[in-house]
Amino acid sequence: MGGKSGWQALESNPETINPFLKKIGVSGVECVDVYSFEDDLLQFLPQPQLALILCFPSSEAREFLSKQYEEVEKNGTKPEGVFFMNQNEDIGNACGTFALFHSLANLEDRLNLGKGKFFKWFEKAKLVKEDERSDLLSEDTDLAEAHDETAEDGDTEQSDQVDFHFITYVNKNGKLYEIDSCAPFPRPLGATSDSSLVKDASVAIKELMENVQNLSFSAMALIGK
């Protein structure tokens, strides 16, 4: 998503994200492409399915998503106990990284976060207020270096105007949450499991796709290993 100059945009593919996970010290998980949300194809996805990262055209989707979050707030169903932070404008085009970090942070009991760059930031981020976490991230030179090294290894030409946004769908203690760094809070979407997360998330994703007249969507599943 577009923003101030800062961290470069990561490509939304496993060839980029999996090496980045290693650079920041995380193991026990890998990204795989999700090519379709049709039931007959989803059955071939590996398990356990821990999270799903979605990339989509930002400007077309923002109005629709805003209405979804307004409905959650109206109904008083804002969740508690979910790690969340808003995107810091100083970081710039790193909404893909926010989606990935939201996934990892809410799966800390399912993954090996190691003792590396992500773990060191996360241990500090858990102790500060929600609105201070992205500032803490923007000040983390170790993560910024690993992030930009990975971005520079990609094939896509960098631009300050990136009109795509990333959000994640995470299984947190058997409940599915949509986490968007540009939204006011995580959105609860009901029950889920390690075998059905992508299918469960596809309900919300298909609704989003139907309301956006643009087919430029891509998705990656985070699979435990």
At which residue positions do the language-model features occur?
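Cysteine-dependent deubiquitinase/ubiquitin-like isopeptidase catalytic cores across multiple families
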Residues: 1-225
